[in-house]
Amino acid sequence: MKKILVAVVVALFSINAMAQHEIGAIVGGMNGASYKYWFNDALALQADLAVGLTEAYWSQTTNGVTTSRSDGMWDFVLNPNALYHWDLPVSNLKIYAGGGLSIGLYDMLKKQPGQSTKVAGKFGINAAAGLAYDFDAVPLVLAFDFRPGYGLGFGKEQGSNDMFTTHMFDWKIAVALRYKL
């Protein structure tokens, strides 16, 4: 039993010895803070906390009536993604792909006449793909992201007890600059 416990402790410390952290900013379709934790040379967890403007294609059902349209929206989201990285033949350049969640708040920029929604909640999934360049001379990483996603919005109209749900497809393009700790 002691040997198993020692083996588990050694394994946990070796995982942390390989771990690398990156912290920085992301701008574009989402603007905010970006953090990345490396589990090994290829697998990482990236979490972004950001505010963004995007075009959403959505349909909304209120009181059994469904409407569909494309509209601009702002959102404030926590966006954690699991990403797998592959080395490219160019030195220090990696391509990555993965997916994750989008959890936060949103509101439409243009409202229909008489529509005055409060800020609504948002939960969804997204894919993520991009390129990352790791600078040799300084501990910086520059990354370009593309993130298409599907989300579900939910909330209430002001002055009403009627709940609404909104199904939306959105996408974001962003650039991140992170410092390697």
Q: Which ranges hold each PLM region?
A:
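Sec-dependent N-terminal signal peptides
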Residues: 4-13
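Short secondary-structure boundary/capping segments within folded domains
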Residues: 24, 36-39, 150, 167
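Gram-negative (and chloroplast) outer-membrane scaffold detector with strong preference
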Residues: 37-144
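Sec/Tat signal peptide C-region and signal peptidase I cleavage site
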Residues: 13-19
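Predominantly the C-terminal beta-signal and adjacent terminal strand-loop region
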Residues: 43, 54-58, 136-181
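Transmembrane beta-barrel architecture of outer membranes
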Residues: 22, 30-34, 75-79, 122-126, ...
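Transmembrane beta-strand segments that form the barrel wall of outer-membrane beta-barrel proteins
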Residues: 19-31, 44-53, 103, 149
